[in-house]
């Protein structure tokens, strides 16, 4: 996938791509550990910005990411002259970025710093690959509008030198941001999905486990464990770590214990009870149904769930809008949706099955 992305950039097929994957599916690891190192090998100067690093102020996230990228400059020390107003302080990114004291700076000062940093990176002469992780966060607050406009001002004039990978873990959040009329920056980006991990990944992890412990895992048991954690690599890696720690080879027993320890029962119960009955019915149909929620069959199912003779399309549309606004569902094709959280989908089915 990393080669494919870079090849598309290099042949001029596009200057911007959007990579979607639900949380904990390995998206950030792919970008940081695979894509960006490969880009550097191909002569790119790489920039990684995670807008969840500093959720309250994405400008800080952008400054931190750009500052970290200056370590790739042969004359990185010169950047200090441009940032003399920043004092060494206690802000540190999770990936070990530079320390900067940003607290108390005005928005204008931060935007000026962003422009200065970006200009300095451009003057290096290499092509830039900037990965903007969890970019959908920019659409969650009107106060973040200056960052959206700043990004447009940074990127648009330099499409011949700058390639962009937008990434996000909320399909609905990305769609809301990209469809905004006042954010044409994102409209030209082509979307790709992070491929799901399969048997090759499980065999690789089993090999790593054997090298670390001398113990052999049954591949069929690994497949079942992976299925139980909804094919989420993060959870599967946690299970492998627990198995290394506790000993033995019973990956299914460790998986069941892990799921019990990380149950979201209380959270899901509260979320479910806070939903309107029609929203609950729409969720159940989306999980169980074979068509979108607007068909006659779907609306009759929803009506039956509510104890009504019928429901109109507008009622269903309002429910869908609420669920999308709360990032509970996201469209996957015209008129069809899926839940953003597969664990929540399983919990709902179990809730309906037991009639609670």
State the predicted function of each range.
Residues 176-227:
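Helix-loop-helix "sensor" segment of P-loop NTPases
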Residues 207-267, 277:
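Amphipathic alpha-helical "lid/sensor" segments that cap RecA-like P-loop NTPase cores
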């Amino acid at each position: 996938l990393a080669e494919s992305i870079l090849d598309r950039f290099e042949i001029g097929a596009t200057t911007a791509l959007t990579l979607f994957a639900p949380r904990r599916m390995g998206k950030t690891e792919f970008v940081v550990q695979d894509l960006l190192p490969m880009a550097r090998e191909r002569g790119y100067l790489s920039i990684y910005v995670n807008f969840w690093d500093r959720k309250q102020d994405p400008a800080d996230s952008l400054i931190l990411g750009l500052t970290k990228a200056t370590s790739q400059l042969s004359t990185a020390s010169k950047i200090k002259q441009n940032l003399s107003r920043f004092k060494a302080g206690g802000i540190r990114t999770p990936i070990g970025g530079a320390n900067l004291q940003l607290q108390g700076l005005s928005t204008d000062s931060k935007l000026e710093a962003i422009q200065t940093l970006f200009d300095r990176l451009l003057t290096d002469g290499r092509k830039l690959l900037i990965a903007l992780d969890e970019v959908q966060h920019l659409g969650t607050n009107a106060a973040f509008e200056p960052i959206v406009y700043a990004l447009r001002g940074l990127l648009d004039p330099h499409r011949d030198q700058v390639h962009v990978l937008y990434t996000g873990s909320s399909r609905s959040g990305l769609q809301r941001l990209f469809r905004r009329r006042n954010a044409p920056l994102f409209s030209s980006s082509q979307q790709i999905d992070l491929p799901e991990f399969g048997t090759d990944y499980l065999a690789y992890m089993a090999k790593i486990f054997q090298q670390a412990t001398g113990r052999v895992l049954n591949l069929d048991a690994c497949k079942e464990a992976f299925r139980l954690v909804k094919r989420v690599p993060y959870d599967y890696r946690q299970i492998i770590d627990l198995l290394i720690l506790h000993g033995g080879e019973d990956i299914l027993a460790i998986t069941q214990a892990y799921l019990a320890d990380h149950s979201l029962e209380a959270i899901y119960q509260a979320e479910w009870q806070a939903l309107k009955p029609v929203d609950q019915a729409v969720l159940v149909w989306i999980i169980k149904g074979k068509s979108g929620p607007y068909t006659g069959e779907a609306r009759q199912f929803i009506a039956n769930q509510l104890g009504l003779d019928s429901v109109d399309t507008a009622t269903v549309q309002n429910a869908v809008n609420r669920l999308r606004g709360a990032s509970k569902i996201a469209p996957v094709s015209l008129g069809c949706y899926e839940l953003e959280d597969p664990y929540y989908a399983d919990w709902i089915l179990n809730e309906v099955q037991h009639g609670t």
